[in-house]
Amino acid sequence: MHPRFQTAFAQLADNLQSALAPILADHHFPAMLTAEQVSTLKNTARLDEDALAFALLPLAAACARTDLSHFNVGAIARGVSGNWYFGANMEFLGATMQQTVHAEQSAISHAWLRGEKGLAAVTVNYTPCGHCRQFMNELNSGLDLRIHLPGRAPHTLRDYLPDAFGPKDLEIKTLLMDEQDHGFTLTGDTLTQAAITAANKSHMPYSHSPSGVALECKDGRIFTGSYAENAAFNPTLPPLQGALNLLSLNGYDYADIQRAILAEKGDAALIQWDATAATLKALGCHNIDRVLLG
């Protein structure tokens, strides 16, 4: 078990501990539960879906990287597939505050990058900030997405974001978590192809500036992130943050990164290179390359 989970795990009910122990035994537990695992945990712990999600929130919050605020927020995105995806906030010392990943963004991008097609609910241990409410409004679940908070009745995103502005106001039909493939040809080595594949998945209906990042760890594991734009612009999630989020959720540290590649168009309206390189260098990675999409 990764050390970050030990305190939260010890506070769980005995029957839930017994059911979770084999799942968490892997040091690189992927911070997600399959639909089958969720069903098993519900039956073993004798909890309904909402109660189980609340019980697991401390494990999600344990994934937080909060070197600046020391305020851990955890979230669980519940996919329409039945799979659950952990998320937690991430802060990057030496970078800028704008590079921060919020817990809801973490869980949602986690689900998206693993191929989830839509979300039914998000469970989070603190009220979503305005930034996250706007980020969630980009999803194909729209304002019907259920938000679950401890000690409160569940509400929809519509309740938390009245008079919402979103992609429909800009006549955008393809939403975040809808399947997208921009068709860029895969070239180069495995890591380069992974970055291009991530760029092909980008959600960028406002700038038309696709980008993807691939990070290779010292053990050969590769994590990718795709660019996810937002109708309000500022809640947009850069591709590097998506990749770093997956890397961290899987129990890796920034020191494990040995190489990084950004894929983007050289003549795009928005360029990720400077911000990507600066953040990676702040985290100790200097082997950074860029491939231009044709």
Curated annotation (Swiss-Prot):
Q: Which GO terms describe its cellular component?
A: cytosol
Query: Which reaction equation describes what this protein catalyses?
Result: cytidine + H2O + H(+) = uridine + NH4(+); 2'-deoxycytidine + H2O + H(+) = 2'-deoxyuridine + NH4(+)
Its EC number is: 3.5.4.5
GO BP annotation list:
cytidine deamination
Q: Which Pfam families match?
A: dCMP_cyt_deam_1 (PF00383), dCMP_cyt_deam_2 (PF08211)
SUPFAM superfamilies listed in its UniProt record: Cytidine deaminase-like
Which Gene3D superfamilies does the record associate with it? Cytidine Deaminase, domain 2
Domain CMP/dCMP-type deaminase, residue spans: 48-168, 186-294
Question: What Gene Ontology molecular function terms does this protein carry?
Answer: cytidine deaminase activity; identical protein binding; zinc ion binding
User: What's the domain of life for this entry?
Assistant: Bacteria
Keywords of this entry: Hydrolase, Metal-binding, Zinc
In this chain, Zn(2+) is annotated as bound at 102, 129, 132
* UniProt record similarity statement: Belongs to the cytidine and deoxycytidylate deaminase family.
The record, for HAMAP family, names: Cyt_deam
**What is the protein's given name?**
Cytidine deaminase
* Designated gene of the protein: cdd
